[in-house]
Amino acid sequence: LAAQLGLIQRSTRVSIDQPAILVFAADHGVVAEGISAFPQDVTWQMVENFLGNGAAINVFARQNGCALHVVDAGVNHDFGPRPQLLHRKVANGTRNFALEPAMTAQECATALDHGMVLARDLPATVVGFGEMGIGNTTSADALMHKLTGQPGGRWVGARGGSALLPRPARPVPKGRRLT
């Protein structure tokens, strides 16, 4: 890790000043396919938990001297102003990619731009990234399928609560026909 930081910082004297963690939160429309044992409302409830310093990431950040910033990138909930919350909502979640494209090209570009600007503008030399959103594992699997052409399901392990599901949901194959 030290060698990687040195290469990134182009220095043999690695500096870890004001480390920060950005947790991006958003809802995923593919949840409508029954892929999660948990309701979509858990996304905004977890954001509230982060903001109330009640989650594991809060403990990790505190114990490691990291500033924690929660980013509303597309939660289907309206949050009031909070010191730790950065409002960068692109939409109230994505659409169901098993039925239609999850995002428009413009929505995707805007979301990526928000992330780049946030990472660039933080007064930190080291930034950690996290994510929260019911359905995020299935969405990540679909992205990896599109990026690599490899079969869906090979990139992710068991989803949170998947043992509670009555049947395995398979939205990634359905979504393959979409461009």
Set out the residue ranges of the language-model regions.
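N-terminal loops that bind phosphate or other acidic moieties
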Residues: 1-179
